[in-house]
Amino acid sequence: MNIRTRMKYILLILFSLMGFLITSASADCVNCNFDEKNLANITFKDQNLSYASFKGAYLVNADFTGANLQGSVFDGAYANGAIFVGAQLDNSSFKSVELELANFTNASMRNVIFEGAYLVHARLTKKQVLESNFCDNLVEDAMKFIGWC
C-alpha cells in the first residue's frame, strides 16, 4: 500500500472519529469553529454551542434540538431540513442561509438576523417572526409572511 492510500485511510478514520465525538459527546462547545465543515445529518441535541461559528457550513438535516445556540453565526450556511426544535437562538445570525424546510418549532429567536435568508417551507410562528429581526431584514421569500410584520 502506498503512502497516499495510507493517508486516505488515516484521514477517513480521523473524520469518522470526529463525527463520533460530535454525535455522542455531551461536552460544551462554546465559541467552537465549524466554518465550512460538512456536518450533514449530525446530531447536536441539547449541546451548548453558544457563540459557535457555522459560517458556510453544510448542515443539511443537522439536528440542533434543544441546543443552546445563543450568539451563534450561521452566515452563508446551507441548512435545508435542519432541526432547531426548542433551540435557544437568541442573538444569532442567519445571513444568506438556505433554510428550506428548516424546523424552528418552540425555538427562542429574540434578535435573530435573517438578512437574505431563504426560508421556503420553514416552520416559523408569528411570534418567532416578530421576536427576531425578520421583519427588518430582506428575506428571499418574505411574501409567505405578509401581514405578520
Label every model-predicted segment:
Residues M1-M7:
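N-terminal secretory signal peptides that target proteins for export/translocation
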Residues T23-C149:
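Tandem repeat scaffolds
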Residues L12-F20:
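Bacterial N-terminal signal peptides
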